[in-house]
């Protein structure tokens, strides 16, 4: 899609945004456009943009993996201090929750994850990762920079906030269920809704996408250890071969999706690794394999989990072995399906279209990817939107989790403005409703 001329030129500065005058004044029409485009205009100011880009690059150069985001968290707190924004730290070890507004209901959350991946960056550029074997290959550095940008926009216009905005800087998204850990803290008990924005490399830079209802799969991880009896390879009759048993189980697990699930219901069972002995002429004592399973329904996820255990144990038994099946139960073993609240989605879509035009809003397809942001759906209304960062001229378009992943930083202002405009307009609409509820109770 050609994005030339897709952004509107704004001549009214951010500081002259019109005050809220009546309930729902930002719900649609010129009021919402003025808010959304004004936020974007301010975020695209050269000084503002360079500030955000500098934050993003500092984080990118110093990536930290799950629950080790100490420098990243310190940077977040330093920036919040400079903005005069209050916060709580630590939340879930390295997380930060900040707030702007009246400290009263309603409360709307904005979330950014902070952790990097254990991956060697292969992109050669001036802000390449300085940490060997670690890289921000999922855009979380960008998420943090955009949320800090939103904090600056909101702090400048906090007189517009009819309630409270909570800024959630979350650790440990990549396999650590950091969202689940953060939700244990009472500071997030009062959320009335929450938004997360994730960069996406197949949408043109600056475009926004989402969908109502189911958007991402529920997911789980599993490991299976098959215990047998080892022997010399020349005397297999003295063994209980765990490699053979594990191999049979891996093949049998693929029949869950092909023969046990409704063909109209999506599901995935993928074995990502298998390991056994280390010698060519020895049958080992044990073998191990592991992988992930996905479904677009929570019931489907539970069914697949149960069948992984049953099939693995049964196949091991056929070969006189025993299978030990583990679903990482020390932490949440299942990430729930990510379902966008339809009302929150519709509101976010209106904000996005008011900001960048209807032609630049994309219907995001359902995918089998997983996101621990889905834990927030069990707490409150939640919606995830994606922000395009694709720019083939820059080489930005490689998949998430690729060592060649690269971001077009020109999208930063759009993400910051989307966060801020969404929060202000949502609270404006629901703040008046909350006031009416309080009056009726009195």
Swiss-Prot record:
Entry EC no(s): 3.5.1.-
Cofactor(s) the protein needs: Mn(2+); Cu(2+); Co(2+)
Top-level taxon of the source organism: Eukaryota
Binding site for Mn(2+) 2: 138, 140, 198
Biophysicochemical property: pH dependence: Optimum pH is 7.5.
GO cellular component: endoplasmic reticulum
Pfam family, one: Peptidase_M20
Purpose of the protein: Hydrolyzes certain amino acid conjugates of the plant growth regulator indole-3-acetic acid (IAA), including IAA-Phe, IAA-Leu and IAA-Tyr. Can also use IAA-Ala, IAA-Gly, IAA-Met and IAA-Glu as substrates with low efficiency. No activity with IAA-Ile, IAA-1-O-beta-D-glucose or IAA-myo-inositol. Is the most efficient enzyme of the ILL family for IAA-Leu hydrolysis. Important for IAA-Leu and IAA-Phe hydrolysis in roots. May act with ILL2 to provide free IAA to germinating seedlings.
NCBIfam families for the chain: amidohydrolases
The name this protein goes by in its record: IAA-amino acid hydrolase ILR1
